[in-house]
């Protein structure tokens, strides 16, 4: 388990994973979220790590499904057919 606390207290992120597992669960709490979370808000997403980030990005760009990019963090998001965001991560 890892935990990240914002210096200003605005969020807490907790990462959970089995010791021998390949999967990680990220739980985020936002202090200033105005109401109870509603699943329809799309305040959750899945993230996928790829061995060939550049090729994945090129394919997703060609498909026109990239909805948000954060070059400073080295990540981007695509949308699935239902409009949910999927995070694409480079190798560690």
Predicted segments — roles?
Residues 1-22:
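Core segments of cupin and vicinal oxygen chelate
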Residues 1-4, 28, 70:
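Solvent-exposed beta-strand sheet faces enriched in polar/charged residues
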Residues 19, 39-85, 91:
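Vicinal oxygen chelate
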Residues 33-35:
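Short beta-strand/turn micro-motifs at beta-sheet edges
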